[in-house]
Amino acid sequence: MNELALKYGCNPNQKPSRVFMNEGELPFEVLCGRPGYINLLDAFNSWQLVQELRRATGLPAAASFKHVSPAGAAVGVPMSETLKKIYFVDDIKEPLSPIATAYARARGADRMSSFGDFIALSDTCDLPTALLIKREVSDGIIAPDYTPEALEILKAKRKGTYCVIKMSTDYRPKPIERKQVFGITFEQGRNEIDLADDALFANIPTENKNFSEEAKRDLKIALITLKYTQSNSVCYVKDGQAIGIGAGQQSRIHCTRLAGQKADLWWLRQCPKVMALPFKDDIRRADRDNTIDIYMGDEYEDVLAEGAWQNFFTEKPEPLTREEKKAWLAQNQKVALGSDAFFPFGDNIERAHKSGVEFIAQAGGSVRDDHVIATCDKYGIAMAFTGVRLFHH
């Protein structure tokens, strides 16, 4: 089959819609459901991301995509009991497989953004992974294969309409890619730059030149994630997973702030006071996510006011004070930060430092590089100039 008709394009009024190959057969098979235009944009971008993470780290990888940018990306590094709890997988008694662990991390980092996501897996979707996916609100999944038990579970999701795509691992696109805008065809070479090479970290202009192996791994995860994120973009990574992605912002500092805010919320969810929130047993996962998000923010009274807290909790929690948040956030450390282009000013470093960043990889080449370097030196941050820009549109 070299063509697949779609219900509509980006919006219901954009008809007809299809995906097709000018030469050869489509490199994927729809095993269940009917994918939409945006579903497939998410699927094919996320597929590239997880395959590249797999090659760069040697670990199974997963991504959670929404509107053609990742909400989360991770590799299969074992999780702490704390992470299992905040990702709502602590009730799973059997050990999670590496690919299930990667998925739990990718989905769990920014659960608010991942609601209704499209999932990508680098490896075969097994039963533990399918059981995790079964409990989440998601639009679909792309993977190289599925075990029979996993496929049975996924085909039953959303009353049999859940989108399940099997992607060929042999497929290699041509080196030239094209797209049309306003009837005009754009053509460019594919972005096939290798981000797995340690040579990326050869140019280190900061006083601190020490990058641990874990830091290099996390910086590679950040850069590969950014390669498939709408620009401008910045990505915070810790312990083998993205913890804050700032996508599609017009200014670099707003990327850094947005991603930093997400990273802070990820860390705050691990605060004992947040983890001990006395939720009612019948609160749905999505409502729990939303309530936690509000509780950690400035509008906490929306869930703690009299007449409101009773809807979510068995007893009224105490607010998480500004001082408590500041003290907890100060404990975050060893965070890696990647940027899809150079940092023009040191304000980005100031903001990154507040979220525990100790390692940075960015293109370099700003007229204010000296100021950026000096700000890193102020905090003992190790920074590499990669010389690589990673814009994606």
Residue ranges and their predicted role:
Residues 117, 121-122, 135-165, 170-172, ...:
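C-terminal binding/interaction regions
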Residues 71-112, 243-342:
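Glycine- and Gly-Pro-enriched alpha-helical subdomains that act as flexible
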Residues 52, 228, 265-269, 354, ...:
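Conserved helix-loop functional segments at active or binding sites
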Residues 22-34, 109-115, 188-207, 286-308, ...:
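Gly-rich Lys/Arg/Thr-decorated short loops/hinges at beta-loop-alpha junctions or inter-strand turns
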Residues 69, 125, 238-241, 249, ...:
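Active-site-proximal loop/turn and secondary-structure-junction residues that shape catalytic pockets
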Residues 56-64, 164-167, 231-238, 268-279, ...:
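Flexible, glycine/charged-enriched surface loops at secondary-structure junctions
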Residues 213, 217, 221, 227, ...:
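C-terminal accessory/binding modules appended to enzymatic or scaffolding proteins
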Residues 1-197, 215-233:
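Active-site loops and adjacent core secondary-structure elements that bind or stabilize anionic groups
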